[in-house]
Amino acid sequence: MAKDTGKTVKVRLVRGLRGTQSRHRLSVHALGLNKINDVRELKDSPQVRGLINTVHYLVKVED
């Protein structure tokens, strides 16, 4: 098994999803975030960065 040497990024949901667009709610769930203050450590990839850019006003990125 190869070692995982890729960088990771921590994402925290800091705002609730009430009143947001359904597309943005789906993006937050795709990041694995469900409740306020949920934190996920994700592999830093263009796909993840795109999801973060979509919901930048709902999440906080902790490198």
UniProtKB/Swiss-Prot annotation:
Keywords: Ribonucleoprotein, Ribosomal protein. Coiled coil: none annotated. InterPro entries: Ribo_uL30_ferredoxin-like_sf (IPR036919), Ribosomal_uL30_bac-type (IPR005996), Ribosomal_uL30_ferredoxin-like (IPR016082). The keyword Transmembrane helix does not apply. It holds the Pfam family Ribosomal_L30. One of its GO terms (biological process) is translation. One of its GO terms (cellular component) is cytosolic large ribosomal subunit. GO terms for molecular function: structural constituent of ribosome. SUPFAM superfamilies: Ribosomal protein L30p/L7e. Gene3D superfamilies: Ribosomal protein L30, ferredoxin-like fold domain. Part of the 50S ribosomal subunit. Belongs to the universal ribosomal protein uL30 family. This is Large ribosomal subunit protein uL30. It comes from Xanthomonas campestris pv. campestris (strain ATCC 33913 / DSM 3586 / NCPPB 528 / LMG 568 / P 25). The gene is rpmD.
